[in-house]
Structure formats: structure tokens, C-alpha cells
């Protein structure tokens, strides 16, 4: 699966589970870490965990794709590493605090 196809598939799953403020950032020119960041907000800690769980489950079920790693399950910020796409799922307070969009403001925003 190409990186842009992957980010759109991930975003569609998160959107179907009522993730808020979905933002995709093309980071290829800014970092070697990944090609894209996908940022989403959950309405509560339970919602954040449910979004991460459903994303992992649906990506495996629909595409046979598993994350290379998952961090932060016990916090308000869960990171799922899909190689070319890093998915950040935040609670509102953590998203506002870390403000990844500002940190990567020079990167291209992708229409979802």
C-alpha cells in the first residue's frame, strides 16, 4: 500500500469511529521518521483507547496491515507506527499542549 493510500485508509477508519479534527501532514521533506503524520482527537481517554484499538483491528482485518509499534496506551496520547505513517491520537488537552501542527507548520497539509 502506498503511503498516501495508507494515510487515507487510516483516516477513513478513524473518521468512522468519530475521531475529531483529523489532520494529515506530509512530512517527507521535514523528517526521515515517516512520510505522513495523521493526527486525531478523541473525546475522552476511553475514546482515545477505543480509536487506537479499532484502528489496529480494522487495518488488520481490511488490509492485513499491523502497526510496527504502539506507544502510550496508558496516557492521553497514543502513537501507532505504520512505518510510512505515524498516527497520533490525542485527548484534547494533550493535543493542544503538544500542538504538532505548529511544530510541523512548514509541512504540506493533505486533504482527507
Where is each model-derived feature located?
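Polybasic/polar functional segments that serve as interface/processing modules
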Residues: 1-33, 45-78, 82-85, 92-94, ...
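Catalytic metal-binding acidic patch
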Residues: 35-37
Amino acid at each position: 500500500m502506498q503511503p498516501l493510500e495508507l494515510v487515507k485508509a487510516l483516516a477513513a477508519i478513524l473518521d468512522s469511529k468519530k475521531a475529531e479534527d483529523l489532520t494529515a501532514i506530509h512530512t517527507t521533506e521535514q523528517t526521515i521518521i515517516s512520510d505522513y503524520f495523521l493526527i486525531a482527537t478523541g473525546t475522552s481517554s476511553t475514546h482515545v483507547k477505543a480509536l487506537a484499538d479499532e484502528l489496529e483491528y480494522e487495518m488488520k482485518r481490511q488490509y492485513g496491515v499491523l502497526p510496527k509499534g504502539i506507544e502510550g496506551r496508558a496516557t492521553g496520547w497514543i502513537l501507532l507506527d505504520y512505518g510510512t505513517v505515524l498516527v497520533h491520537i490525542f485527548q484534547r488537552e494533550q493535543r493542544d499542549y503538544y500542538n504538532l501542527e505548529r511544530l510541523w507548520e512548514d509541512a504540506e497539509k493533505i486533504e482527507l
